[in-house]
Amino acid sequence: MAAEQTHATSNSVRWAISSWKRREFNYGDADCCAFIAHVASELTGRDYRKFITYSSKDEAYGIIEAHGGFEALMDSVFEHQGEPRDGDPCLVKLPIVGEMMGIKLGNTVVCITEFGLSQMPDRYILKGWNLCQVQ
């Protein structure tokens, strides 16, 4: 797939999500950022996992704070901002939980939480980043 010219299909997004090795939640290994890095890498062939440079909750939140928030951190990783489509990373804000990252799929966002993979309605999306340029 020419990542800069086409966009992921729903089937390829489902495949990338299902290729995630399910394991216990762990910052830097199995958290929301590691999950989106995995899916983005599977869909584009680019290594987004290299941006996961922390191994604890304190380190993760320190990086977020140093960038001025989750949105600014993701702006530094993903190039193309726009209306999220299937396979695109999204920042969501959930009641009680707060902000987290997920992958757009249909009218939902697939996120990894301390309880495993979950699908949230896309109405909670604050911002999305297009992995592929919109033509």
Question: Could you say what each language-model-derived stretch is?
Answer:
Residues 42, 107-109, 126-128:
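General N-terminal targeting signals
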Residues 32-33, 90, 111, 132:
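Generic recognition of cysteine residues
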Residues 56-123:
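...with weaker cross-activation on analogous glycine-rich loops/strands in unrelated enzymes
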Residues 1-65:
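N-terminal capping segments
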Residues 1-19, 115-135:
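Non-catalytic ligand/cofactor/substrate-binding and regulatory segments of enzyme domains
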